């Protein structure tokens, strides 16, 4: 079964790590022109219209029982081969290869942190939501807090939120909205997608990974925070301490993508060992 997930608007025009293959950086995350602009805009228009406090809470209720599927982490990785991600017109290969490429990039740069290697393998597994029938605007893309006014660095902020009912609700339409100053991102309701879902899967199944790993998974698509430097009014000191880890992971999130595919069969035993160490057995999804 193949499910079209793309285009993932958060993954368009991102650079490679290798400077020899990197393009002009001005062309990356370009939301003013380009062949994919219309469909990327449409994706964000749907996202920014429908991602409300009530919608996100309904998705937590819908998926919070973790009763959709029982499978191991490696089975979830293999399921990514059934996802057709149309966000990258230049490189066409299964998402599972990207998982291993990201993990191997981290492994090379941080050989002493095996838990970090596993984060690379895990980070996009929440995209199995697409196999459960979720629309792509509720699976992929940059994330943002609901329940408060969107900040300036949110993609298409000025042109896609007009029909979002929360912005007509005085509880949710101010800079702080329903939150207290510096309440901490752990008390913030994030827009629903593969980041938040995978974070919840990890918590429910009691992954024995360090807090940094949970932050990387939950916030790797929160570009308005880790790159746009917005939403500081919600951050606690713990969030600021974790921010360098999220940014470090961001270097490898798709930046390691290249047509030289890894030999997955040779890599599987190493990563299966990490799975057995940190998140073994059949998990609830």
Curated annotation (Swiss-Prot):
Keywords: Cytoplasm, Iron, Metal-binding, Oxidoreductase, Phosphoprotein. The modification Phosphoserine is found at residue 33. Changing residue 127 to S: Strongly reduced enzyme activity. Coiled coil: none annotated. It is an enzyme of class 1 (oxidoreductase). This is Inositol oxygenase. PANTHER family: INOSITOL OXYGENASE, MYOINOSITOL OXYGENASE. Belongs to the myo-inositol oxygenase family. It comes from the Eukaryota. The keyword Metal-binding applies. GO terms for biological process: inositol catabolic process. Substrate binds at residues 29, 85-87, 127, 141-142, 220-221. Fe cation 2 binds at residues 124, 194, 220. Binds 2 iron ions per subunit. The keyword Phosphoprotein applies. The gene is MIOX.
């Amino acid at each position: 079964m193949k499910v079209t997930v793309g285009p993932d608007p958060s993954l368009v025009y991102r650079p490679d790590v290798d400077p020899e293959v990197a393009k002009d950086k001005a062309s990356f995350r370009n939301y003013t022109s380009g062949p994919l602009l219309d469909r990327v805009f449409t994706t964000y228009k749907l996202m920014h219209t429908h991602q409300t406090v009530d919608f996100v809470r309904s998705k937590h209720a819908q998926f919070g029982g973790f009763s959709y599927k029982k499978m191991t982490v490696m089975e979830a990785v293999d399921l990514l081969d059934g996802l057709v991600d149309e966000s990258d017109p230049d490189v066409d290969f299964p998402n599972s290869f990207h998982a291993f490429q990201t993990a191997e990039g981290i492994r090379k740069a941080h050989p002493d942190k095996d838990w970090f290697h596993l984060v690379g393998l895990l980070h996009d597994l929440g995209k199995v939501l697409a196999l459960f029938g979720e629309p792509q605007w509720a699976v992929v893309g940059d994330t943002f807090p609901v329940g408060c006014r969107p900040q300036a660095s949110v993609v298409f902020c000025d042109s896609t939120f007009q029909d979002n009912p929360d912005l007509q609700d005085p509880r949710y339409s101010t800079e702080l909205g329903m939150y207290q100053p510096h309440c901490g991102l752990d008390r913030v309701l994030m827009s629903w997608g593969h980041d938040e879902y995978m974070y919840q899967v990890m918590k429910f199944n009691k992954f024995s990974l360090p807090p940094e790993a949970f932050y990387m998974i939950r916030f790797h698509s929160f570009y308005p925070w880790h790159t746009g430097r917005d939403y500081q009014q919600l951050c606690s000191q713990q969030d600021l301490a974790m921010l360098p880890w999220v940014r470090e992971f961001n270097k490898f999130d798709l930046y390691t993508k290249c047509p030289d595919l890894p030999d997955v069969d040779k890599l599987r035993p190493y990563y299966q060992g990490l799975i057995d160490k940190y998140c073994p057995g059949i998990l609830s999804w």
